[in-house]
């Protein structure tokens, strides 16, 4: 059922408190999942970023590219594997990831946003020393496990991103970054988004997923929560499914780093970012400091 004109006006008026609270603030959005594979959702996400920008909010997009990387690896006949929720990255896999993230996924999103005007600029963690990486391991069945050329973010230099924001642009960040010796790593986009949100002093970190939010007792659909504090979330972490772990670790990192709230939202919902930021119902789970 379509809204009447007064109803549409009321929707806009109802959003005013949130628009006021976020005016001039930075919101880091991790773009991934179905939202980056479905054409309708991709277009809606791009429109959401432009909406935020034109309302005086500063969106910064950090994107993944898991499905696209997997598809390219398959096309090239290169084996792929995951451990602890992270992609095992050999030198061959890294070259594919580098090509796909910046040359395909990032370019597509930049073009979708720029259909509305000269807003988006794509950069990588390699540009202007944005990210300095350090090699990481992951815990698999309680054992620290090497996963190849996969890095964590050791340092963030926000100068380039802040320059883009000051120029009225929307940074679109691909998460490939070198260490201090110049060896390049693939950084999980969830991890990178949290580190960037912390370094920028962002007001919010939004994580797009393919679920309705956080379930405290999956697969019990009744265990979906709309808000949880960081202590309760940390206790829940060992029970979560492997694919959700990097996202929840990222939320906790952001909260511990001073970001007021992190949000795990359903990227399958059209305009999910606007729904989460500007409605009472939201589109997922809000994480706050204990």
Swiss-Prot record:
It comes from Mycolicibacterium gilvum (strain PYR-GCK). This is Acetylglutamate kinase. Its EC number is 2.7.2.8. The record marks 30, 247 as: Transition state stabilizer. GO terms for biological process: arginine biosynthetic process via ornithine; L-arginine biosynthetic process. Pfam families: AA_kinase. Keywords: Amino-acid biosynthesis, Arginine biosynthesis, ATP-binding, Cytoplasm, Kinase, Nucleotide-binding, Transferase. It catalyses: N-acetyl-L-glutamate + ATP = N-acetyl-L-glutamyl 5-phosphate + ADP. It is found in: Cytoplasm. Belongs to the acetylglutamate kinase family. ArgB subfamily. Catalyzes the ATP-dependent phosphorylation of N-acetyl-L-glutamate. InterPro entries: AceGlu_kinase-like_sf, AcgluKinase_fam, ArgB, Asp/Glu/Uridylate_kinase, Glu/AcGlu_kinase, NAGK-C. GO terms for cellular component: cytoplasm.
């Amino acid at each position: 059922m379509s809204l009447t004109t007064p109803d549409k006006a009321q929707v806009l008026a109802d959003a005013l408190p949130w628009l006021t609270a976020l005016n001039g603030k930075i919101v880091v959005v991790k773009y991934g999942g179905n939202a980056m594979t479905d054409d309708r959702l991709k277009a809606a996400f791009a429109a959401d970023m432009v909406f935020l920008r034109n309302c005086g909010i500063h969106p910064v997009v950090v994107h993944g590219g898991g499905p696209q990387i997997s598809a390219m690896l398959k096309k090239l006949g290169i084996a792929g594997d995951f451990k602890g929720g992270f992609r095992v990255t050999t030198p061959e896999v890294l070259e594919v990831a580098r090509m796909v993230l910046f040359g395909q996924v990032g370019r597509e999103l930049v073009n979708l946003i720029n259909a509305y005007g000269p807003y988006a600029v794509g950069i990588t963690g390699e540009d202007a020393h944005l990210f300095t990486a350090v090699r990481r391991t992951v815990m698999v069945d309680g054992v620290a496990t090497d996963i190849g050329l996969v890095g964590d973010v050791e340092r963030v230099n926000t100068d380039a991103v802040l320059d883009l924001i000051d120029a009225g642009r929307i940074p679109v960040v691909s998460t490939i970054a070198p260490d201090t010796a110049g060896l390049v790593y693939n950084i999980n986009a969830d991890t990178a988004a949290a580190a960037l949100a912390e370094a920028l002093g962002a007001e919010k970190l939004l994580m797009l997923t393919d679920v309705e939010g956080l379930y405290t007792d999956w697969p019990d659909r009744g265990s979906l929560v709309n808000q949880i504090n960081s202590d309760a979330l940390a206790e829940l972490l060992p029970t979560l499914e492997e694919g959700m772990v990097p996202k929840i670790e990222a939320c906790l990192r952001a909260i511990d780093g001073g970001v007021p709230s992190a949000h795990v939202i359903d990227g399958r919902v059209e305009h999910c970012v606007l729904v989460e930021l500007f409605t009472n119902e939201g589109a997922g789970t809000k994480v706050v400091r204990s």
